[in-house]
Structure formats: C-alpha cells, structure tokens
Regions:
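Positively charged, phosphate-engaging catalytic surfaces used for nucleic-acid and nucleotide handling
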Residues: 1, 6-196
Length: 196
C-alpha cells in the first residue's frame, strides 16, 4: 500500500506520504520497544481528558485482560464467540449486566465499555478477570462448560466485593456515567478545588 501511494507523482499526495512514513516509523519503533505503545496510549487518553489515575487503572486493566485471553488461548479457546460469551458471563456475574446491557445502561453505542468505566468499575472488572485467570490456571478446565463455570466463579469474587463495598458505602458501584460525564465531573471538581 505504501509503495503504491509513494508512486503517485502528485504534490497533493506529499503530505499524506509524509504522514504515512511517520506512522509506519512509529509502529516499527513500537514493535522494537513495546513501552512506546504504552506511552502513546497514555498520551491519547490524556488528550481525551482522562486523569492520570484513571489512565493507570485502564492500562493495568488492559494487561489483566491480556493475561486472561492468553490463558483462554492456552486452553484452546477461540477468539470471537467463545471469548465474548465468557466475557458476558463475567460481566453478568459481577455487575448483574451483560456487555450489551451494561453499554445500554451507560448510553454507549460502539464505544469501548472499559473506556467508559469508573475507577471502581475498572477495579472490580480487573478483580473478576484476574480471579477467572487464576482459577483457570489452577483447575485447567477442558470443556467450554468448565470454562463457563470458571468465569462464573471468577465473576462471583468481584460480585462479593461489589456487594460488600455497596453495603459499607451505601452507594451503587455500577454507574450510568460514561467517560464524557466522568471527565466533566472531574473537571468541575478540579475547578472547585482550585477556587478554594
């Protein structure tokens, strides 16, 4: 593709060629040093207005999710329908909502659900996914039904923590707030803190 675009002699194509060359260089650099990918992700989240605390939580959640999907691959599960089904079971167990219901609750359409979770939701989702991975490594499930059971057990650990936190604080953990609303609230909070 790059060679094809390079062969276009138009001066109007020059800025696009330069952009493509820069992007290709960045991706090749990231392949050599994966930390650059993390830094780029942090800068992109920062540009969208996310707080440093939320960004750190989100990057950790990406790492934990990858560990879980690596475990599922090790067990012979296939990406796509099986991963989606198990993810739905984990969400349904700890949050009482499937992925689709959770996204609807937050007013999302195509946006990434995890990018629209609050810190508490991210932490509990990480607990559910980490617990599922640990139980899977310990029990070595073989059939898909055994994986379903493991996903429920992992989600139950986070569900118990969610219920306990809600009892202690008197506040619901599952929030209808999406990223735009959370960012707006954080900005208003920062303004009021500066005024004091």
């Amino acid at each position: 593709m790059f060679r094809l675009i390079q062969s276009i002699p138009s001066p109007k194509a020059e800025p696009f060629k330069l952009w493509m060359a820069q992007t290709a260089k960045e991706r090749l650099d990231e392949m050599q040093d994966p930390e650059l990918t993390i830094q780029r992700s942090m800068m992109e989240y920062k540009a969208l207005g996310y707080s440093d605390n939320w960004i750190n939580q989100r990057l950790k959640s990406i790492e934990i999710r990858k560990e879980l999907t690596d475990e599922w691959k090790r067990c012979g599960l296939e990406e796509g329908a099986q991963f989606a089904t198990l993810t739905d079971i984990i969400y349904q167990t700890w949050a009482d909502k499937t992925t689709k219901e959770y996204k609807r609750f937050k007013g999302l359409k195509k946006e990434n659900l995890r990018d629209n979770m609050t810190n508490k939701e991210l932490v509990l989702n990480m607990l559910a996914e980490l617990s599922t991975k640990e139980i899977s490594e310990t029990n070595n499930p073989e059939s898909f039904n055994e994986h379903v059971d493991v996903a429920r057990r992992g989600g139950s650990i986070a569900r118990d923590a969610r219920i306990r936190l809600e009892e202690e604080t008197g506040q619901a953990v599952i929030s209808p707030l999406n990223a735009k609303e959370v960012l707006r609230l954080e900005q208003n909070k920062d303004k009021s803190n500066k005024e004091q």
